[in-house]
From Swiss-Prot:
Family: Belongs to the DXR family.
Requisite cofactors: Mg(2+); Mn(2+)
InterPro entries reported in the protein's UniProt record: DXP_reductoisomerase, DXP_reductoisomerase_C, DXP_reductoisomerase_N, DXPR_C, DXPR_C_sf, NAD(P)-bd_dom_sf
Catalytic activity: 2-C-methyl-D-erythritol 4-phosphate + NADP(+) = 1-deoxy-D-xylulose 5-phosphate + NADPH + H(+)
Residues annotated for NADPH binding in this entry: T10, G11, S12, I13, G36, N38, N124, E126, G215
Single GO term (MF): NADPH binding
Superkingdom of the organism of origin: Bacteria
Protein's UniProt name: 1-deoxy-D-xylulose 5-phosphate reductoisomerase
Record's subunit section: Homodimer.
Pathway: Isoprenoid biosynthesis; isopentenyl diphosphate biosynthesis via DXP pathway; isopentenyl diphosphate from 1-deoxy-D-xylulose 5-phosphate: step 1/6
Species this protein is from: Sodalis glossinidius (strain morsitans)
Matches recorded under HAMAP family: DXP_reductoisom
Annotated residues for binding of Mn(2+): D150, E152, E231
Length: 398
């Protein structure tokens, strides 16, 4: 029986994680749930899974949740704030932590889980985009087990030999016969939209992903392919990959989730329906397997699997991320922070779809900072980048 803390339980990944728990009640128990301000959904989750603890982002949400649970006769202890989230990520009785809080907000609790030597299921890609070196070093120092949950990184992990799985983040790809890691991406809903029309695309159109069911922020990131750019940065840290060992391909069907090229000419790929329950179930059970509730692939109904090179004119955010990864963590932290502000502004109707890349590029050009050596320095860069991005949003929104 594994005992879980779920950081980000009310988000898309958190809900899918709880679906896997529900499918395997004899294998998992939920000890703590941590979320932002979605009190209604957190109330439902506490009623269904009866965790010992629940934590909300602020006192107001926590008070409302506490009243809801008291009225329902549920004895879950309700906490609030970042420090409480960190404490729930390090509970003695918890062995596995799902790190699924979107954005920089999840950094502190994820790092706390690593320092406590937990088995950390990494779904918060921003942790590695902003703190890759620090996080990988802390995982190694405290003997924490880091398992990737993103469908692409989980696919790569499954396609790697066991010594590389054990030596995540520092083992040599070349010494174990790996020549390249191939990240695949659907290209999002605007893959075939005329370039001249991209500026007029609406948030609703950007969030209509053809294959995956995701939250609004990550849906926009998929449309710009910033999501793939962040995954590129994350993959370099997770798999100790140099730029020349990385490759990105468009794969519109989202059936092959990523691939690994070997020096003998072999290519290993992980295939599956585009459903996050599959990589979540794999990470939760590794090295064993448990049912995820996902229907198996029907190869007779699949049709054609196609591939193409990403077009940098259509996806400038992808190239910004690749370039930032070469510059270092100050640049990747800056890009991630600017992008969060830009996407929020687009979803709010303040800027156009094509302005997202323009804001990101402008902020990268305006900020030049030394490499961070601590979470505090990362957060300082993050804060500066957000302020510059807010100014840029005003500039482009005029």
């Amino acid at each position: 029986m594994r005992h879980l803390t779920i950081l980000g339980s009310t988000g898309s990944i958190g809900n899918s994680t709880l679906a896997v728990v529900k499918h395997n009640p004899d294998q998992y128990t939920v000890r703590a749930l941590v979320a932002g301000n979605n009190v209604a959904l957190m109330t439902e989750q506490c009623l269904a899974f009866r965790p010992a603890y629940a934590c909300m982002a602020d006192d107001t949400a926590a008070r409302t949740l506490k009243a809801n649970l008291a009225a329902a006769g549920v004895a879950t202890a309700v906490l609030s704030g970042v420090q409480a989230a960190c404490e729930l990520a390090t509970l003695d009785e918890v062995d596995t932590v799902m790190a699924a809080i979107v954005g920089a907000a999840g950094l502190a609790a994820t790092l706390a889980a690593l320092r406590a030597g937990k088995r950390v299921l990494m779904a918060n890609k921003e942790s590695l985009v902003t703190c890759g070196r620090l996080f990988m070093n802390e995982a190694r120092r405290h003997h924490a087990r880091l398992l990737p949950v993103d469908s692409e990184h989980n696919a790569i992990f499954q396609s790697l030999p066991e010594p590389l799985q054990r030596g995540l983040g520092y083992a040599s790809l070349a010494k174990h016969g790996v020549s390249r890691i191939v990240l695949t991406g659907s290209g999002g809903p605007f893959r075939q939209t005329p370039l001249a029309a991209l500026a007029t695309m609406t948030p609703e159109q950007a969030c209509a992903h053809p294959n995956w069911s995701m939250g609004r922020k990550i849906s926009v990131d998929s449309a710009t392919m910033m999501n793939k750019g962040l995954e590129y940065i994350e993959a370099r840290w997770l798999f100790n990959a140099a730029a020349e060992q990385m490759e990105v391909l468009l794969h519109p069907q989202s059936i092959i989730h990523s691939m690994v090229r070997y020096t003998d000419g072999s290519v290993l790929a992980q295939l599956g329906s585009p459903d996050m329950r599959t990589p979540i179930a794999h990470a939760m059970a590794y090295p064993e397997r448990v049912p995820s509730g996902v229907a198996p692939l029907d190869f007779l109904r699949l049709g054609t699997l196609s591939f193409a090179q990403p077009d940098t004119a259509r996806y400038p955010c992808l190239q910004l991320a690749v370039d930032a990864s070469q510059q270092g963590q100050a640049a990747t932290t800056t890009l991630n922070a600017a992008n969060e502000i830009a996407v929020a502004a687009f979803l709010h109707g303040d800027i156009r779809f094509t302005d997202i890349a323009a804001v990101n590029r402008r902020v990268l050009e305006q900020i030049s900072l030394p490499e961070p050596d601590s979470v505090e320095e990362v957060l300082a860069i993050d804060s500066q980048a957000r302020e510059k991005a807010r100014q840029s949003v005003i500039h482009f929104g005029q």
